[in-house]
C-alpha cells in the first residue's frame, strides 16, 4: 500500500510539472524561467535573462474609473516588442498569467495581438514578423493599476 502511495505521489508530481511547464521547444521542453529560442529551425531552451534578442516594454496610456462597470478602475497599456537582432523575428509567443485581467473579452480590451485560448499572445496575421531592429506595439485594457506579467515564451528567427 505504501509503495502505491509513493508511486501515485510521484505520478502526480510528474503530472503537475508537465501541466505547469508544458511548453515544447523542438525536441526539448522548456522550464519556468526559460525561453524557447529557435534559430533557423534549431531549438534550445535558454534562461530568460539570456534572451537579449527581444525585449518587452510597458507604457501606461491612461487610468480611469468606469461608473458603468461598478466604479472599477481600469488602465490602458501599450506593450512594445523590440527586435534587437540583425534579422527578422518570424514568430514570438508571450506568456501571461492571472494578472492579465482584461476589461472584457472583446477587441475593445486587447488589440494588435492574438490572444490564444491558453492565454498566450502571438503576432496577428497582418504582422507576420518584426523586422531587424524594429518594434511592434499592441495594446490592452486591464482591471486595476498593476501591469500584467508578460514574459517571452518563445522567439523564432
UniProtKB/Swiss-Prot annotation:
Q: Does the keyword Signal apply?
A: yes
* Single GO cellular component term: extracellular matrix
Coiled-coil segments on the chain, per record: none
Q: Which UniProt keywords apply?
A: Developmental protein, Differentiation, Secreted, Signal, Sporulation
UniProt keyword annotation of Secreted present: yes
Which residue positions does the secretion signal occupy? 1-19
Mind telling me which InterPro entries this protein's record contains? Answer: CBM2/CBM3_carb-bd_dom_sf, CBM2_carb-bd_dom_sf, CBM_49, Dd_Spore_Germination_Stalk
Identify the main location.
secreted
Q: Which GO terms describe its biological process?
A: cell differentiation; extracellular matrix organization; sporulation resulting in formation of a cellular spore
Molecular-function GO terms, alphabetical: extracellular matrix structural constituent; hydrolase activity, hydrolyzing O-glycosyl compounds; polysaccharide binding
Give its localization.
Answer: Secreted
Q: What is this protein called?
A: Stalk-specific protein B
Organism, as annotated: Dictyostelium discoideum
Lineage from the top down? Eukaryota, Amoebozoa, Evosea, Eumycetozoa, Dictyostelia
